[in-house]
Amino acid sequence: MATLDLLESLGVEVDFPEAQTCCGQPMLNSGCDTDALPLAQRFVDIFTGYDAIVCPSGSCVSMVKNHYAHLLHDNAPYEAMRTQVYELCEFLVDVLKIEQLPVKFPYKVGLHSSCHGLRELRLASDTERNTECFNKPRQLLEMLEGVEFSELRRVDECCGFGGTFAVSEEAVSCTMGRDRVADHLQAGTQVLTAGDMSCLMHLAGLIRRDKRPIHVMHIAEILAGYE
């Protein structure tokens, strides 16, 4: 709902096709290409014809833009559609080009960069490359009145979720997640945010289990004025 509220507040006409399903990433990541293929084709069938397809998940967007090509060979409708698929922050910065948001958020925010958003969609610069620094999610958060940012020691480290990795390598996944939470704790994070629900669900689960004093919100909720 936060994504819908946010986009409509910015004057965007939004349609939500109720026939949509999972993008198929869990199946493809598990090597089940034949199970992922009908979901990919269904996505193309449902979303072809829209001016823009916006998703509040860098992981799902990367699946559609970068990995459907593995399944949909020489598929003209897909090739035409894939250029219209945007991660939410990418859409706000690069397409709508918004410069201000009338939202107050007087909290110290810790921004987690998902691996797919960072390294496959290039929503921000990473520490592995000697390139000009940029961060589209942070650019949006900086528009909010009263916001303060946590200074993390490892700004773009993986949270450890990795989809089915969290099941097949549970101990490693949880250790990586707790490392990220510890970094936010030392930085004084009050609200931990990201653009991927998968990362947030993983980190939020560890925060609840370990009873850590950090609130978790998707970036769409913050930008839409939720508290």
Each model region followed by its residue ranges:
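Iron-sulfur cluster-binding electron-transfer modules in prokaryotic oxidoreductases
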Residues: 1-227
